[in-house]
Design a protein with these regions (language model features):
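Positively charged n-region of N-terminal signal peptides that target proteins for export
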Residues: 1-4, 8
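Bacterial N-terminal signal peptides
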Residues: 8-16
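A domain-start/cap signature at the N-terminus of enzymes
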Residues: 23-100, 184, 191, 257-264
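C-terminal catalytic histidine-bearing segment of alpha/beta-hydrolase fold enzymes
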Residues: 28, 34, 44, 230, ...
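Gly/Ser-rich "nucleophile elbow"/oxyanion-hole loop immediately N-terminal to the catalytic nucleophile
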Residues: 91-96, 150-187
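Active-site machinery of serine-nucleophile hydrolases
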Residues: 100, 104-164
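Primarily recognizes the serine-hydrolase "nucleophile elbow" in alpha/beta-hydrolase
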Residues: 172-173, 179-223
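Catalytic His-Asp charge-relay segment
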Residues: 224-232, 246
Length: 330
């Protein structure tokens, strides 16, 4: 059970109440690597998203990315290796216990080099900034997958299991609080995190799913987990996936909070909206960015992908969500 326990009657009043590949609990069988679709980033290397004007991101790339170490995990079970980027908290003290967050990038990072998993956006770097570490000293790990590890048909790669053994090995090497391990990811990374919630129930204290979806019929277990699930209404597949999970929660009578707002609202307004959600005392939280609001002025959507690639960083900019994540414990 979660250490953060809410009163059931209060929840019911405050929350929205809703009436090699293998066949496995997190996806469907298949042979070979996952193909295109959202897991494959719909064929786009960067979705046409130019982030050079995001001065905060460019500063993070310059100041934070060099603080990560590129390491290699040797997996005894498969005889394979997996590179990963690791941030160790400054002044790490082995007598203290630290949370750990895993960020899984979208598949545009596959084949783009070991630095791109960090430089592609906010999702990997934000947790290691001085401001975030001052509040939440934490380990940050970003796997460097060499293949697209999930696809829109819910096929999944054995590299995911290697990455999980990597996380376990880190808990044995460093003083990591195993009650405060989190996973997040965008597109392929969010889909992988959905798969992990099924294949490794109870391992993570909380989840942050961004711009992604999974087979909702397999996600009943999320009714007992803590998460934020953030998509753009202009992302056809991710928004449909969110709607399907909401329908599942409704059918099961699960409680949750769901809000929609403009991604162009200022930071204070958006963080206040998150605070209003959290005041409902739900552990299952859904955010939808209003259609068109993840596009910058003059920007056009990515064809059939809509606002898929443009929505990710807006989710990771939500400070109140980041703070909430680190409050969660098993």
């Amino acid at each position: 059970m979660k250490k953060i326990i809410s009163v059931v009657l209060a929840i019911s009043l405050l929350c929205t109440v809703g009436a090699a590949f293998a066949e496995g609990p997190g996806g469907r069988g298949g042979n070979g690597g996952p193909g295109g679709g959202q897991g494959g980033m719909r064929g786009g290397n960067s979705g046409g998203t130019d982030k050079s004007s995001d001065t905060e991101l460019q500063s993070m790339i310059a100041e934070v990315a060099p603080k990560f170490q590129l390491l290699t995990y040797e997996d005894a079970e498969t005889g394979t290796s997996l590179q990963y980027q690791l941030f160790i908290p400054e002044n790490y003290d082995e007598t203290q216990s630290y949370p750990m967050i895993q960020f899984i990038p979208d598949s545009s990072a596959v084949g783009r080099g070991t630095d791109y998993v960090l430089t592609q956006g906010w999702g990997g770097l934000i947790w290691a900034t001085e401001e975030e570490q001052a509040k939440h000293p934490a380990f940050v790990v970003v796997p460097v997958f060499t293949e697209t590890v999930v696809d829109d048909n819910f096929n999944h790669s054995s590299q995911i299991d290697v990455a999980m053994r990597l996380l376990q090995s880190l808990t044995e090497t460093y003083s990591i609080d195993t009650d405060r391990i989190y996973t997040t990811g965008q597109s392929m990374g969010g889909m992988t995190s959905f798969h992990l919630s099924i294949a490794y129930p109870g391992f993570f204290a909380a989840y942050l799913f961004v711009g992604s979806q999974w087979d909702a019929s397999l996600l009943n277990g999320l009714e007992d987990e803590s998460f934020f699930y953030i998509v753009s209404a202009g992302d056809p597949k991710a928004s449909a996936g969110q709607a399907e999970l909401l329908a599942l929660f409704d059918a099961d009578g699960a409680v949750y909070s769901h809000k929609e707002w403009s991604a162009q609202d200022d930071a204070d307004t958006q963080n206040a909206a998150v605070a209003a959600m959290l005041a409902e005392d739900c552990q299952e939280n859904f955010v939808t960015f209003t259609l068109g609001t993840t596009l910058a002025a003059g920007q056009t959507s990515g064809g059939g992908a809509g606002e898929h690639m443009t929505s990710f960083d807006y989710a990771y900019k939500l400070e109140a969500v980041r703070d909430w994540l680190f409050e969660q414990s098993k």
